[in-house]
């Protein structure tokens, strides 16, 4: 029987994990077992946070809109309700950007909604 040279596929698998672990600190970057654990944890965190990012940005936009709306004499919920009633279709991302970069335009939107 011929001699079996082992390790090609195993080495590829291990190197794949170790490449994903680049930039980790200590043994987490070059010891396979700990690197594997850290990579699995990192991938779990990345998966979770890709979903969380959407929530976080929406919360940020809402708080920015609310702060600007309160400066203009109303609050977030009344502003959004008024926009729906007066059929102004601007999403929260664009509204927050307007509140930040163009306060005069945001003020006009608030006055339109209030009237």
From Swiss-Prot:
Q: What is this protein called?
A: Large ribosomal subunit protein bL20
The entry's keywords:
Ribonucleoprotein, Ribosomal protein, RNA-binding, rRNA-binding
User: What organism does the record attribute this protein to?
Assistant: Prochlorococcus marinus subsp. pastoris (strain CCMP1986 / NIES-2087 / MED4)
Q: NCBIfam families recorded for this chain? A: rplT_bact (TIGR01032)
What does the entry list under GO cellular component? ribonucleoprotein complex; ribosome
Q: Which gene is the coding source of this polypeptide chain? A: rplT
Family according to the record: Belongs to the bacterial ribosomal protein bL20 family.
Q: Which GO terms describe its molecular function?
A: rRNA binding; structural constituent of ribosome
Q: Can you cite a GO biological process for this protein?
A: translation
Q: What is the lineage of its organism?
A: Bacteria, Bacillati, Cyanobacteriota, Cyanophyceae, Synechococcales
Q: Which InterPro entries match?
A: Ribosomal_bL20, RIBOSOMAL_L20_CS, Ribosomal_protein_bL20_C
The lineage's top-level taxon is: Bacteria
Q: Which HAMAP family match?
A: Ribosomal_bL20
As for what it does, the entry says: Binds directly to 23S ribosomal RNA and is necessary for the in vitro assembly process of the 50S ribosomal subunit. It is not involved in the protein synthesizing functions of that subunit.
């Amino acid at each position: 029987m011929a001699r079996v040279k082992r390790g090609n596929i195993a080495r590829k698998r291990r190197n794949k994990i170790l490449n994903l672990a680049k930039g980790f600190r200590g043994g987490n970057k070059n010891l396979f077992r700990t690197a594997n654990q850290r990579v699995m944890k990192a991938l779990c965190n990345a998966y979770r946070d890709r979903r969380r990012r959407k929530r976080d940005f929406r919360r940020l936009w809402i708080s920015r809109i609310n702060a600007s709306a309160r400066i203009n004499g109303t609050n977030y919920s009344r502003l959004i309700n008024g926009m729906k009633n007066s059929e102004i279709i601007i999403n929260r991302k664009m509204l927050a950007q307007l509140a930040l970069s163009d306060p005069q335009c945001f003020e006009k939107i608030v006055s339109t909604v209030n009237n």
